[in-house]
Amino acid sequence: MFHADRIIVAFDGSENSKKALLTAIDLAKTVNAAITVAHSHDMKDNQTVIDPPRPAAEASYISGGMTSVPDPLISDVTSPEPMIYEDRTEEVIAEARMMLNEQQADGDIDILEGDPAESIIEHANRISADMIVTGSRDQNRLKKLIFGSVSEKLSAKSDIPVLIVK
């Protein structure tokens, strides 16, 4: 019979991660294990390259016969507001908490940073998890070929058993 003291669930708020959390809750209740919900984000994934707005005066450079437009100052280039990402994290955590409450399950919720697969494996080892539960990711073939999936990386790199829920 399977025995586990702690189960960690990779959770990003997607439908498949919700299925994974429900499966982990059922499994944890069956074997009397503690649950840790881990939401991992990679700040690099949140950063986008923004083509900064050109000053209105640009049109006069072009209409006046100048062939090149001066580059915007570095201070003109803005980066995405980190609050946008923090708001999404809070939303994901609230969803996980609500699901735990609805299922009358206790669990820790931890926010991790870095590559999702690597940070979840490191955290699973740190908390002595006996199993990692994750949802499978529906990706198109090209995206999967280029980036791989978190569930594939978890199963390939983890020494801890990984349950992939579809």
From Swiss-Prot:
Induction: By phosphate starvation, via the alternative sigma factor sigma-B. The keyword NAD does not apply. InterPro entries: Rossmann-like_a/b/a_fold (IPR014729), Universal_stress_UspA (IPR006015), UspA (IPR006016). Keywords: Stress response. Gene3D superfamilies: HUPs. Transmembrane segments: none annotated. Coiled coil: none annotated. It comes from the Bacteria. PANTHER family: STRESS RESPONSE PROTEIN NHAX, UNIVERSAL STRESS PROTEIN UP12. Belongs to the universal stress protein A family. This is Stress response protein NhaX. The lineage of its organism: Bacteria, Bacillati, Bacillota, Bacilli, Bacillales.
